[in-house]
């Protein structure tokens, strides 16, 4: 089998770089963070420029952490400054390096998600100048995988030179630089980009390109720590491995030779993927990814509230989410026969003494290790496949009332339309044989069905008109009364993409 060559490209601090370029600033020399300061200092930072990261600031920290770290860095600068005094501020890294009397400053840029998507589209068009779309997988808004095996001979270039050529074209077109990883499979090119490239010096344009094959991976990364640096190894997997004496990928590879059953006992069928990656193997190709069709599909909507909600207000938000989810189904020509609801409770239910005293249910830990009441989760089957707002809203409201503890504050919710499929493929209710009996008035049943069909047809026309208005005039051009009630979030979320300002 022909050995393949893959390139992974990650745009450097993408959102922050876009904001710098739009201000006429150099992303490599400007202290800038993308965050919505209007949400308080606890808001998550979407991106941080490399110069600001150099002060020990995480790329995905909270805004208050950025401010705190800059304050600490300025204390150190003041201690080292002439006369122990800082005079003036700057958000330019080069100026701060040249003048120790300046205090570190930084720009807070509110996110503009729609604009970042436009930038990403422009960059994708650059990729298409070199690589066909069937050989590109878009991993995220700022990251892609490319199978360049059949292009190297065409361009008479090495993988390194081709990656550099593409990145420099992106830089010239948009002013945004990138990091690349090259590997003999998708896992290796990703790891080369995520781990190896971070430890090599950047060139004058801020570009880093690293390469890995299976043997080089084993030589250089079998001893690398922490395990969470590796693609698809999260904190939970790493913790289990460490509890069983495995702290590196080399340890995992050794265990797969000596005691493979232990890995399967710990991780089930996912152990196969972990073992492959420990040896630097990855059989999946871009061609296979493009050809993949899931056996079942779903459509979902999730939301984390800005503050704890009483259950009744939370139910309003769930209804709003369901309403928009159904419109999404209609827009895509899909139907569903099952709704799933997950509701997560707030930490205040256990930190407030009065609320804690009233709660005697199960407890679980949130991602930060804090105890919270166990989340509510349930599903409800619909009467056949449908995209009726009336039917689905009624079902989800019943499900909410059934599973949610009315004494607990709610913080997050997740609504899923399960088993979705194209409306044309949905089984019809009258398909198959029907058992007749002497006691049913079939004429009345038929008339009842006609009334129901007419109501559904009228509802479908309303849905179509609503979608047409929203597409032409904006998502908030038409709202329901519930969207104007206290605690409703749909109006604000309609002005967002991915939970951030559009």
Question: Can you describe what each PLM-predicted range is?
Answer:
Residues 18, 369-502:
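Acidic, metal-coordinating catalytic segment for phosphate/diphosphate chemistry
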Residues 191-192, 351-354, 425-428:
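Short, well-ordered secondary-structure micro-motifs
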């Amino acid at each position: 089998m022909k050995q393949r060559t893959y390139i992974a490209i990650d745009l450097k601090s993408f959102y922050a770089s876009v904001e710098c370029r739009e201000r006429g600033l150099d992303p490599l020399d400007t202290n800038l963070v993308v965050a919505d300061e209007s949400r308080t200092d606890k808001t998550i930072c979407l991106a941080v420029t490399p110069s600001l990261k150099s002060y020990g600031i995480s790329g995905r920290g909270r805004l208050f952490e950025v401010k705190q770290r800059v304050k600490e860095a300025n204390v150190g600068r003041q201690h080292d400054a002439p006369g122990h005094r800082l005079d003036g501020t700057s958000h330019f890294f080069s100026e701060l390096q040249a003048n120790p009397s300046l205090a570190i400053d930084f720009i807070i840029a509110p996110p503009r998600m729609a604009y970042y998507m436009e930038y990403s589209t422009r960059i994708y068009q650059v990729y298409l100048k070199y690589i066909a779309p069937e050989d590109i997988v878009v991993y995220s808004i700022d990251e892609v995988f490319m199978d360049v095996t059949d292009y190297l001979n065409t361009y008479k270039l090495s993988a390194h030179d081709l990656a550099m050529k593409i990145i420099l074209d992106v830089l010239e077109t948009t002013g945004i630089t990138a990091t690349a990883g090259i590997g003999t499979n998708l896992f290796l090119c990703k790891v080369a980009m995520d781990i190896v490239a971070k430890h090599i010096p950047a060139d004058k344009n801020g570009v880093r390109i690293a390469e890995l094959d299976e043997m080089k991976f084993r030589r250089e990364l079998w001893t690398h720590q922490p395990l969470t640096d590796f693609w698809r190894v999260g904190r939970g997997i790493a913790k289990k491995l460490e509890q069983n004496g495995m702290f590196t990928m080399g340890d995992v590879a050794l265990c797969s030779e000596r005691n493979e059953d232990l890995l399967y006992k710990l991780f089930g069928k996912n152990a196969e993927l972990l073992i492959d990656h420990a040896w630097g193997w990855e059989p999946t190709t871009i061609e296979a990814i493009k050809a993949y069709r899931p056996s079942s599909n779903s459509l979902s909507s999730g939301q984390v509230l800005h503050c704890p909600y009483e259950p009744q207000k939370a139910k309003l938000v769930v209804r709003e989410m369901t309403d928009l989810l159904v419109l999404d189904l209609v827009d895509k020509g899909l139907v569903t026969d099952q709704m799933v609801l997950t509701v997560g409770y707030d930490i205040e239910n256990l930190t407030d003494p009065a609320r804690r005293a009233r709660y005697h249910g199960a407890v679980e830990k949130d991602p930060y290790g804090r105890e919270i009441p166990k989340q509510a989760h349930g599903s409800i089957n619909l009467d056949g496949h449908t995209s009726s707002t009336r039917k689905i809203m009624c079902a989800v409201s019943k499900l909410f009332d059934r599973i949610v503890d009315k004494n607990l504050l709610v913080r997050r919710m997740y609504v899923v339309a399960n088993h979705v499929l194209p409306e044309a493929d949905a089984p019809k209710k009258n398909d198959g044989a029907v058992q007749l009996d002497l006691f049913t008035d079939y004429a009345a049943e038929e008339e009842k069905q006609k009334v129901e069909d007419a109501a559904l047809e009228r509802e479908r026309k309303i849905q179509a008109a609503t979608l047409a208005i929203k597409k032409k005039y904006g998502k908030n051009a038409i709202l329901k009364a519930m969207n104007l009630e206290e605690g409703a979030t749909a109006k604000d979320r309609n002005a967002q993409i991915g939970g951030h300002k559009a």
